[in-house]
Amino acid sequence: MEKSWFNFMFSKGELEYRSGLNKAMDSFAPIEKTTIKKDRFIYDMDKNFYGWGERSSYYNNVDLLVSSKDIRNFISDDTFFVRDSNKNSYSIYFDIKKNKFEINNDLSDLEFFFYSYCSSSYLNNRSKSDNDLHYDPYVKNTKSNCNNHINSCIDSYFRSHICIDSYFLSDSTNSNESYIYNFICSESGKIRESKNYKIRTKTNRNRNNLMNSKDFDITKNYNQLWIQCDNCYGLMYKKVEMNVCEECGHYLKMTSSERIELLIDPGTWNPMDEDMVSADPIKFHSREEPYKNRIDSAQKKTGLTDAVQTGTGQLNGIPVALGVMDFQFMGGSMGSVVGEKITRLIEYATNQCLPLILVCSSGGARMQEGSLSLMQMAKISSVLCDYQSSKKLFYISILTSPTTGGVTASFGMLGDIIIAEPYAYIAFAGKRVIEQTLKKAVPEGSQAAESLLRKGLLDAIVPRNPLKGVVSELFQLHAFFPLNKTEIK
């Protein structure tokens, strides 16, 4: 039987939850009153209730955070030593295989909830004798119904208390291999959106096991709210964190729409050439999937017509022309549509004397369009020459991860100021291509933004949080000011 430690800490209506699994209690922090008393309230799942009382419930309206169908994966044959915010300690014993559920006499918050749950969720919805508090025909002498009841009790308790910060310390082969955040879901299928809730995950388990675990399928169902770190595999609410992992600082990919929202003032974005789509100019043939089908599937996935969004807007009140590439659309590859949209954007910025920002995120030229995609490099570079040399206008290039191939070889490195995100992968040829061609190992980190900055290929590395302010100051330094000076931030 494994022993587990729960540390409940209440702060601003939020309970911080931490669990550790270990074979012995010696390795845990000081524990008060951890011995199990003889006088325990016992529920035998093959019999009846013992010790349940009638109390009103105040947990009826809480959101469900733990699914009852998953709770058995988390709790099976375990003793939990629990300490609440008042430092009161008590133990809970679950053994679903042997159909037993026991808690000691020092129940505190958990006892009250189980009392309340049984009286409100089960006893109030049936007829019974006023003198018979143990009679519960809803719970039959079958293993499945009893297990369901235990699951429901635990489920309902966790849905009102479970939170955040979970890490597993067990080296036991019997310890559960799943993270607690896999259970954070509701009956309506939506994850709780409260700003008081964050998820932090610490683990010393093998990362390959985590990557292969099916536990991470949660991001497929809730990717509009939550995003998973590629580096430490923790979950975070992406709207709050701007896709930056708060545990390891790893920068995750952002969509073009998210970057527009990051840089452009609300309500000022005016897109350009939204209806421009590729017509498969060279009739590219593929055995796996026709080019047109790939375009259609990428459009359905991203909601975009191609791998770049262009338009005008205001950045802290300063009118700007902005183009943002989207890596989710066929790897941000540059085809004829991408090249044409960027070219038209630069020409418009030239005519209107607007500062220009291009946010790069691309795998290079799109091979399905052959030499037409390669010609976009020359076309964009040509209009940039007129914009920068003839009109003396200001162009900022922002390189994100990854920026490679034809984009790096053309407009990506032509900015008057070249800014990169931290840890961005920036290269012409990828590491694998170089190693296969030259038969030499590429040093780790040699194609990262930090390495390029040391070699003078970049002007600055700017995190996402201050990026908008930095760009605004650069524009003002080059005599581009807000339309309304009160909008300066």
From Swiss-Prot:
<dbReference type="GO" id="GO:0005524">
    <property type="term" value="F:ATP binding"/>
</dbReference>
<dbReference type="GO" id="GO:0008270">
    <property type="term" value="F:zinc ion binding"/>
</dbReference>
<dbReference type="InterPro" id="IPR034733">
    <property type="entry name" value="AcCoA_carboxyl_beta"/>
</dbReference>
<comment type="function">
    <text>Component of the acetyl coenzyme A carboxylase (ACC) complex. Biotin carboxylase (BC) catalyzes the carboxylation of biotin on its carrier protein (BCCP) and then the CO(2) group is transferred by the transcarboxylase to acetyl-CoA to form malonyl-CoA.</text>
</comment>
<keyword id="KW-0150">Chloroplast</keyword>
<feature type="binding site">
    <location>
        <position position="245"/>
    </location>
    <ligand>
        <name>Zn(2+)</name>
    </ligand>
</feature>
<keyword id="KW-0275">Fatty acid biosynthesis</keyword>
<keyword id="KW-0444">Lipid biosynthesis</keyword>
<comment type="pathway">
    <text>Lipid metabolism; malonyl-CoA biosynthesis; malonyl-CoA from acetyl-CoA: step 1/1.</text>
</comment>
<dbReference type="GO" id="GO:0016743">
    <property type="term" value="F:carboxyl- or carbamoyltransferase activity"/>
</dbReference>
<dbReference type="GO" id="GO:0009570">
    <property type="term" value="C:chloroplast stroma"/>
</dbReference>
<dbReference type="InterPro" id="IPR000438">
    <property type="entry name" value="Acetyl_CoA_COase_Trfase_b_su"/>
</dbReference>
<dbReference type="GO" id="GO:0009317">
    <property type="term" value="C:acetyl-CoA carboxylase complex"/>
</dbReference>
<comment type="subunit">
    <text>Acetyl-CoA carboxylase is a heterohexamer composed of biotin carboxyl carrier protein, biotin carboxylase and 2 subunits each of ACCase subunit alpha and ACCase plastid-coded subunit beta (accD).</text>
</comment>
<dbReference type="GO" id="GO:2001295">
    <property type="term" value="P:malonyl-CoA biosynthetic process"/>
</dbReference>
<keyword id="KW-0479">Metal-binding</keyword>
<dbReference type="InterPro" id="IPR011762">
    <property type="entry name" value="COA_CT_N"/>
</dbReference>
<feature type="binding site">
    <location>
        <position position="232"/>
    </location>
    <ligand>
        <name>Zn(2+)</name>
    </ligand>
</feature>
<dbReference type="InterPro" id="IPR029045">
    <property type="entry name" value="ClpP/crotonase-like_dom_sf"/>
</dbReference>
<keyword id="KW-0862">Zinc</keyword>
<keyword id="KW-0276">Fatty acid metabolism</keyword>
<keyword id="KW-0547">Nucleotide-binding</keyword>
<feature type="binding site">
    <location>
        <position position="248"/>
    </location>
    <ligand>
        <name>Zn(2+)</name>
    </ligand>
</feature>
<keyword id="KW-0934">Plastid</keyword>
<keyword id="KW-0067">ATP-binding</keyword>
<dbReference type="GO" id="GO:0006633">
    <property type="term" value="P:fatty acid biosynthetic process"/>
</dbReference>
<protein>
    <recommendedName>
        <fullName>Acetyl-coenzyme A carboxylase carboxyl transferase subunit beta, chloroplastic</fullName>
        <ecNumber>2.1.3.15</ecNumber>
    </recommendedName>
</protein>
<keyword id="KW-0863">Zinc-finger</keyword>
<dbReference type="Pfam" id="PF01039">
    <property type="entry name" value="Carboxyl_trans"/>
</dbReference>
<feature type="zinc finger region" description="C4-type">
    <location>
        <begin position="229"/>
        <end position="248"/>
    </location>
</feature>
<keyword id="KW-0443">Lipid metabolism</keyword>
<comment type="similarity">
    <text>Belongs to the AccD/PCCB family.</text>
</comment>
<dbReference type="GO" id="GO:0003989">
    <property type="term" value="F:acetyl-CoA carboxylase activity"/>
</dbReference>
<keyword id="KW-0808">Transferase</keyword>
<feature type="domain" description="CoA carboxyltransferase N-terminal">
    <location>
        <begin position="225"/>
        <end position="489"/>
    </location>
</feature>
<feature type="binding site">
    <location>
        <position position="229"/>
    </location>
    <ligand>
        <name>Zn(2+)</name>
    </ligand>
</feature>
